[in-house]
């Protein structure tokens, strides 16, 4: 089973796959780089102004606290903290933040739904993230009347070393890979970019092997290319691997 996440985010998937008796192939198609931009510095400088801070990834939390270690102590006690899911909540908690909102649906849409019970009109909202993310969340917040600062906290791009991803493509085309997991639309798009002139052939192969997507947004990107994928009810790596294992006739405890 191939894992296309960045290496530093792959340990859980590898452990689950190997624990189920499979062999994990780490072939990152995405690289995350911290970006200590002026907009992120502004999030730190204005820490005591925020009514709501939203984190949609572990990388955003880690980048902000790398730049501004005292952030948790600088925000107001009545400032709410919202995160995309339980893993981001755990990382935020490790940095001293009290997490107030975790949506049931671990997507931007889920976060917006979780905020609908609040009147956030006029609120100052900090949203540190990658600028390559979808615009659904900031636009939705603005439609609710919030003043949103989207701060670039990290950059998502092709890995500097595409060798492992190229080996994955070779393995898929040679029939040596049984399944591939994707955890974001970018992991899908970047694999196709790395494939280059083998893109069409790769897409046809992915239509035949087992593919897992962590959630509906990633699934949608795959479906744009006619690729079907297993998607878990809860959008976590553990649930994705479990759903894939069941689909392949395995069992993950």
UniProtKB/Swiss-Prot annotation:
<dbReference type="GO" id="GO:0006780">
    <property type="term" value="P:uroporphyrinogen III biosynthetic process"/>
</dbReference>
<dbReference type="InterPro" id="IPR039793">
    <property type="entry name" value="UROS/Hem4"/>
</dbReference>
<comment type="similarity">
    <text>Belongs to the uroporphyrinogen-III synthase family.</text>
</comment>
<dbReference type="GO" id="GO:0006782">
    <property type="term" value="P:protoporphyrinogen IX biosynthetic process"/>
</dbReference>
<keyword id="KW-0456">Lyase</keyword>
<dbReference type="Pfam" id="PF02602">
    <property type="entry name" value="HEM4"/>
</dbReference>
<dbReference type="InterPro" id="IPR003754">
    <property type="entry name" value="4pyrrol_synth_uPrphyn_synth"/>
</dbReference>
<protein>
    <recommendedName>
        <fullName>Putative uroporphyrinogen-III synthase</fullName>
        <ecNumber>4.2.1.75</ecNumber>
    </recommendedName>
</protein>
<comment type="pathway">
    <text>Porphyrin-containing compound metabolism; protoporphyrin-IX biosynthesis; coproporphyrinogen-III from 5-aminolevulinate: step 3/4.</text>
</comment>
<keyword id="KW-0627">Porphyrin biosynthesis</keyword>
<dbReference type="GO" id="GO:0004852">
    <property type="term" value="F:uroporphyrinogen-III synthase activity"/>
</dbReference>
<dbReference type="InterPro" id="IPR036108">
    <property type="entry name" value="4pyrrol_syn_uPrphyn_synt_sf"/>
</dbReference>
<comment type="function">
    <text>Catalyzes cyclization of the linear tetrapyrrole, hydroxymethylbilane, to the macrocyclic uroporphyrinogen III.</text>
</comment>
């Amino acid at each position: 089973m191939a894992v296309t996440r960045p290496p530093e985010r792959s340990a859980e998937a590898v452990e689950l796959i190997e624990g189920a008796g499979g062999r994990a192939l780490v072939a990152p198609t995405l690289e995350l780089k911290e970006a200590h931009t002026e907009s992120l510095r502004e999030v730190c400088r204005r820490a005591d102004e925020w009514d709501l801070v939203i984190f949609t990834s572990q990388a955003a939390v880690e980048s902000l606290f790398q730049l501004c270690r005292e952030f948790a102590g600088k925000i107001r006690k009545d400032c709410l903290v919202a995160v995309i899911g339980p893993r981001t909540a755990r990382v935020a908690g490790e940095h001293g933040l009290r997490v107030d909102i975790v949506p049931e649906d671990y997507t931007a849409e889920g976060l917006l739904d979780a905020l609908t019970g609040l009147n956030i009109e006029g609120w100052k909202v900090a949203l540190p993230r990658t600028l390559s993310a979808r615009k659904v969340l900031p636009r939705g917040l603005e439609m609710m009347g919030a003043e949103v600062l989207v701060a670039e906290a990290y950059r998502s791009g092709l890995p500097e070393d595409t060798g492992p991803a190229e080996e994955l493509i070779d393995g898929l085309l040679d029939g040596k890979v049984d399944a591939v997991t994707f955890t974001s639309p970018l992991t899908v798009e970047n694999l196709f970019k790395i494939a280059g002139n083998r893109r069409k052939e790769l897409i046809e192969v992915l239509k035949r092997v087992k593919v897992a997507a962590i959630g509906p947004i990633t699934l949608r990107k795959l479906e744009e290319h006619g690729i079907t994928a297993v998607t878990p009810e809860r959008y976590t790596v553990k649930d994705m691997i479990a759903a894939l294992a069941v689909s392949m006739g395995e069992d993950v405890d």
